[in-house]
Amino acid sequence: MASEKSFENKIKRYLKDNGCYRVKYHGNYFSENGTPDILACVNGYFLAIEVKAQTGTPSELQLVKVDDIRKAGGFAYVAYPSGWEKLKDIIDGLLIDRFNREEDVILK
């Protein structure tokens, strides 16, 4: 299975290859804890992705931030390497304005 960093790079590359703006969020002393790892604009839609290694677990604060983004109308997910195809489907759906806001938060 992919490491968290290699999976993160795969996601960023896919976003870039599809013309999406994306930024890797680096938390530090002055930033807000729990913010997802990747923040992106996909065809005008806000997408936030908390990237996890296959055995990783999101913190409660990370889940709260994902929920806050979804409540604000954005798309936010916790993505695992085994959920790569689901994540690609979500990104592809945003690219063509066809998406399901009811998709599970955890993509495994």
List where the protein language model places each region:
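Catalytic phosphate/metal-binding cores of nucleic-acid and nucleotide-processing enzymes, i.e., regions
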Residues: 1-108
